[in-house]
């Protein structure tokens, strides 16, 4: 099957989820409607996240306890590799990301090892001016600390070749994994491109998401604690 001219049979979409029973089924259905294989890793949720994800058509793995988003993503990535994925896409569970952006990310891997989604090259819906200012501050801080020149620091919508997985293995279990990936991309010399994407801040995602201040604090904590 093809989506936007891109073959879907060798790409897996990995979603880490915690307490997302309210939205995860619709998120999974949006992705699977495009012909993509989806694995949802329920990171120890006390609600019906796992069953709702399964109802949406995802392969579901469960952590017995909450280990953090980084750990959940790595669990899903490992499954995708075992299932023979050639390409892997990470996708948020809270409805922020648009499945329509996946084909462009995967297509970008024809000339790159990793494609990072950029909301600042694309569009942002529902974010306040203060949030946007903090997100831009996080980008500036990330670029200073990582030595990279990106337009977006921590967009969770990204694609990479399975061959890049060993170099990008996530060891930061919680939110610092996004900073860890940037450092590993820089150190490994992997070819990276940015792709415009849409990020949608809904009432649900705003209630669950981290603030810009938290993002900057996580950046400093990771880069200075591990340097």
Regions found by a protein language model. Give the residues of each.
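Acceptor/aglycone-binding surface of glycosyltransferases and processive sugar-polymer synthases
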Residues: 65-82, 99-175, 201-227
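N-proximal low-complexity "stem/linker" segments adjacent to membrane-targeting elements
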Residues: 1-30
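Catalytic donor-sugar/metal-binding loop of nucleotide-sugar-dependent glycosyltransferases
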Residues: 149, 170-173, 182-200
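Short beta-strand/loop segment that forms part of the nucleotide-sugar
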Residues: 15, 27-28, 36-45, 61, ...
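Short beta-strand-to-loop acidic/aromatic patch adjacent to the donor-nucleotide binding site
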Residues: 85-96
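Acidic helix N-cap motif at the loop->helix transition within catalytic regions
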Residues: 22-26, 47-56
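A conserved acidic beta->alpha catalytic loop
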Residues: 42-51, 95
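Cell-envelope/extracellular polymer assembly enzymes that use nucleotide-activated donors
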Residues: 10-12, 37, 180
